[in-house]
Amino acid sequence: MLLGTALWCRGEIQARRRETDRAAELAAALGEMAAEIRSLRRPMPRLLERQARRVLCGGCFARGLWGLERGQPLQDAWEDGFRELTPPEAAGILRDTELTGDEERIVSALTAAVHRLEELADRRRRESRQRERLLWAAALSGAGLFIILLI
């Protein structure tokens, strides 16, 4: 029972960390995209193709690229790419990012999304530390109670 509780706590903590790491990686990816649009003037399909190689969030960019290749408008493909993303807050930030207009407007939208994702990742890290302490305290209290009941 103790081992099961410890494994459950560990799984919860790892899942939460993965979501936080994904938000941070998304912020880095969007920052990279904004820089490449600004300096290299790369087209969006090439940018999505590059970001599709990322470990934690590449699948979202790949789905967006797939939608573009099927003929979807950029904004629709972008929103579809991030529809099932976790954490849901990050998905909302990305779906709300408007990729319409000229280069300057797109770069501005990506940069704003980067800042919001970085804030989300920072907030989740702070919450995660507190949640980890509570989980372990609850698990140890439960284990102690179980041992007392056995005695």
Where are these regions (language model features)?
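Amphipathic alpha-helices that form helix-helix packing interfaces
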Residues: L26-A29, M33, G64, A90-L94, ...
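Juxtamembrane/interface alpha-helical elements of multi-pass membrane proteins
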Residues: M1-W66
